[in-house]
C-alpha cells in the first residue's frame, strides 16, 4: 500500500512537472522522457567500469588508430558546425551576453536555437566513445571517476536544459564549449596519428590554459545573475547548476595546472605509443 501510494505521488509529481516542458522539442530523438537516456547512460557506466574491462582482461588491446582519427576529426567538424549555429541563432545575432531569456516562439531564429541545443545534447552521446575507446585499448587508468562523471552528467542534465530552456544565457557554456572542442579534438586527432606528428603538439600547455579560460568565462558569465535584479530568466535553477559545474571544473583544472606546471612535477608524456594522455572536457 505504501509503495503504491509512493508510486502515485511520483507519477503525479512527474505529470505536474513535465506539463511545463517546451512542446517544440517533444518529437526530437530521446526527448519524450528522461528514461531512454537514463538507460543508455546506465549501460555506458556499467560497460566502461565493469563489463568492458572484464571482457578485455584476457584480450589484446584493439588497434583503433584509423577509427580514432576519423572519430576525432568528425567531432572537430561537428563542433565547428554547432559553434556556427550557436552564433547564428543567438550569440552572434542579438544576444547581449547578459540577461538573455529563452525565446519560446516559433520564429526561425528561436527554432534554430532549439535545434542547435538538441544537437549539442546529442553530441554528448557521441562523445561517450571517448571512454569506450579507452576501454577497448585497455587504457583503464584514464577511465577515472572524474572522466566518467563528466561524460554521464553532461548529457543527463542537458536533457532538462533542452526540454525546458533551449536558449538564452544558459546556453553560453555550450557555445563556448563547442569552440574549445574544435581545438581539443584537433589535438586528439593529431595525437592519434602517431609519433610522427608529435612535433605539431607543442601547444599542449596552451590547451590546458584554454580549458581554464573556458571555465573562468562560464563562471563569470553565469555569475552576473547575482548582480542583475531585473533579470527574468525563466529557469534560474539551471544557472546554479551551470555555475556549480563551472566552479568545480575550474578548481580541478587549477589543481592540475599547479601540479603540472607550477609545482614542477613532470607531466604525463604527450604520447605513449602514439596515443594522447589528456583531460577531455
UniProtKB/Swiss-Prot annotation:
Give the enzyme's EC designation: 2.3.1.199
Location(s) in or outside the cell: Endoplasmic reticulum membrane
Coiled-coil residues: none
* Domain of life assignment: Eukaryota
Positions where N-acetylalanine occurs in the chain? 2
What does the entry list as the binding residues for 3-oxoeicosanoyl-CoA? 124, 137, 139, 142, 147, 187, 204, 208, 211, 266
Q: Some GO term, biological process aspect, for this entry: which one? A: fatty acid elongation, monounsaturated fatty acid
Q: Which residues lie on this side of the membrane: Lumenal?
A: 2-27, 94-115, 163-171, 228-236
Q: Which reaction does it catalyse?
A: a very-long-chain acyl-CoA + malonyl-CoA + H(+) = a very-long-chain 3-oxoacyl-CoA + CO2 + CoA; eicosanoyl-CoA + malonyl-CoA + H(+) = 3-oxodocosanoyl-CoA + CO2 + CoA; (5Z,8Z,11Z,14Z)-eicosatetraenoyl-CoA + malonyl-CoA + H(+) = (7Z,10Z,13Z,16Z)-3-oxodocosatetraenoyl-CoA + CO2 + CoA; (6Z,9Z,12Z)-octadecatrienoyl-CoA + malonyl-CoA + H(+) = (8Z,11Z,14Z)-3-oxoeicosatrienoyl-CoA + CO2 + CoA
Question: Which key words tag this protein in UniProt?
Answer: Acetylation, Disulfide bond, Endoplasmic reticulum, Fatty acid biosynthesis, Fatty acid metabolism, Lipid biosynthesis, Lipid metabolism, Membrane, Transferase, Transmembrane, Transmembrane helix
| One cellular component term from this protein's GO annotations in UniProt | endoplasmic reticulum
Which residues are annotated as active site?
150
One short Pfam name that applies is ELO
Q: In which pathway does it act?
A: Lipid metabolism; fatty acid biosynthesis
Segments carrying motif HxxHH motif: 147-151
* Principal EC category: transferase
Q: Name one GO molecular function term.
A: fatty acid elongase activity
The domain-related comment in the record is:
The C-terminal di-lysine motif may confer endoplasmic reticulum localization.
Q: What family is reported?
A: Belongs to the ELO family. ELOVL7 subfamily.
| Assembly, per entry | Homodimer. Interacts with TECR.
Give the protein's recorded name: Very long chain fatty acid elongase 7
Q: From which source organism is this entry?
A: Mus musculus
Gene name of this polypeptide? Elovl7
